[in-house]
Structure formats: structure tokens, C-alpha cells
């Protein structure tokens, strides 16, 4: 969860749960987890996804949660074994780096990928990246989350290929496009503020 979305509830939004399951499965298929020792989760937020990764990894693996918005309290919080937090770029070269819904927050995504993310990668490392899609769905919800943009598939892949070799690509969560489109339409009609994030969710498993 993005730190800006943290609320009073500890329940996870269904979208977060499905997203975590998707990326856990993707990582299990894409990386040789028996050889993964160092993991960096860039823009890790509250670190829930990073903690969900731990059971997949070898016992001596270390997951570093990197988020520039960590407070002093965040940095001294109790964390599970093998999980660390930092507000500055880690010096380690990781075997696996996750960058999930992060680069849309960065004004200069090109330089960020090249100069900040690139140096984190060890030889033969895997980088898993996701972004919000469909620029036409950019809304007040995106603005409230400090998103600079949404991406077309081509824009996203072109940006990645400037700095990395893209081994695989795909799309996901298309089932959320219709609800998002309805929300954007309501927002433009003045019937929705679009500002509620996953941290303010209090529904059941069938309510998003």
C-alpha cells in the first residue's frame, strides 16, 4: 500500500490481495528463487507485499523495502525476519527488484529507471515492473495519489527498453477497467471526488 493511502484499517483491499497473488505467481515463474538472496522492493510503501514475498524465498534471503517517504517511526518499526526498510537507495545489487506502480509517481521516469533502478540490478537479475494503464482513465484519484501519468502499453515498453532488456510483458486486472471507467465518468459529471484510496476501504471481499 502506498504510504499516502494508509488508513486506520488493517484489512487489505481485495485489489491488493489479487495483485499480490498475481505478482507472487509471476515471480515464482520468472526467477530462479533458489538463487535469489537479495530483493529490493522499490516504492515499497507499508511493506505488505514485500512480506508476502518472504515465504517464496530461501531462508537466508533479505528483502529491502525502499521508500523515500518512510518516516523515522517507519524505519524503526518491528519487521519480520529478513525484511529491512530504508529511505535511501540501497547499496546492494539485488537478484530481484520489484517496481510495482511506482514510476508513474516520478516526473522524470526515464532518468529514474536508468540512474536509480539500473544500479540496483546484479548480473542476470530480474526486474518486475507494473504501471497504471490507459491514459484516458487518468482521474482525480490519480492526481490524489500524485500520479504524473498513466501509460499505454507501447509507451511503457518503450520506456523500459531504453534501459533494460524486456524478457516478457503482459496485461492484467482488465476486470477493473469497467469500474474505473464508470468512476471516471461519474467524476467528470461531478458525482465523485475520486479521492478514496485503498487505505480507506472498509468493505467485504465482494465490495471494492
Residue ranges and their predicted role:
Residues 7, 127-149, 153-159:
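Short, glycine-/aromatic-enriched active-site segment of Class I SAM-dependent methyltransferases
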Residues 179-208:
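C-terminal helical/coil "lid" or tail adjacent to the Rossmann-like core of SAM-dependent
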Residues 1-96, 100, 110-115, 197-200, ...:
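Conserved N-terminal segment of class I S-adenosyl-L-methionine
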Residues 101-105:
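Short catalytic micro-motifs in class I SAM-dependent methyltransferases
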Residues 111-126:
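A short glycine-rich, Lys/Arg-flanked "PGG" loop and its adjoining helix->strand segment in the class I
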Residues 57, 121-123, 160:
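A generic alpha-to-beta junction signature in SAM-dependent methyltransferases
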Residues 164-174:
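Conserved S-adenosyl-L-methionine
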Amino acid at each position: 500500500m502506498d504510504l499516502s493511502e494508509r488508513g486506520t484499517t488493517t484489512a487489505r483491499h481485495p485489489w491488493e490481495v489479487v495483485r499480490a497473488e498475481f505478482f507472487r505467481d509471476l515471480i515464482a515463474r520468472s526467477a530462479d528463487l533458489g538463487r535469489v538472496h537479495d530483493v529490493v522492493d522499490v516504492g515499497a510503501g507499508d511493506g505488505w507485499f514485500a512480506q508476502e514475498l518472504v515465504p517464496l524465498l530461501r531462508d537466508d534471503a533479505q528483502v529491502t523495502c525502499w521508500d523515500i517517504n518512510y518516516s523515522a517511526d517507519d524505519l524503526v518499526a518491528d519487521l519480520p525476519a529478513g525484511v529491512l526498510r530504508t529511505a535511501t537507495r540501497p547499496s546492494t545489487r539485488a537478484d530481484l527488484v520489484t517496481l510495482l506502480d511506482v514510476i508513474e509517481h516520478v516526473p522524470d521516469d526515464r532518468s529514474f529507471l536508468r540512474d536509480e533502478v539500473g544500479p540496483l540490478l546484479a548480473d542476470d537479475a530480474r526486474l518486475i515492473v507494473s504501471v497504471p494503464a490507459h491514459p484516458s482513465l487518468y482521474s482525480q484519484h490519480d492526481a490524489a495519489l500524485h500520479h504524473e501519468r498513466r501509460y499505454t502499453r507501447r509507451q511503457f515498453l518503450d520506456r523500459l527498453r531504453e534501459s533494460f532488456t524486456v524478457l516478457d510483458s503482459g496485461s492484467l486486472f482488465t476486470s477493473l477497467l469497467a469500474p474505473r471507467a464508470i468512476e471516471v465518468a461519474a467524476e467528470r459529471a461531478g458525482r465523485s471526488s475520486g479521492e478514496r484510496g485503498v487505505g480507506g476501504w472498509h468493505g467485504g471481499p465482494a465490495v471494492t
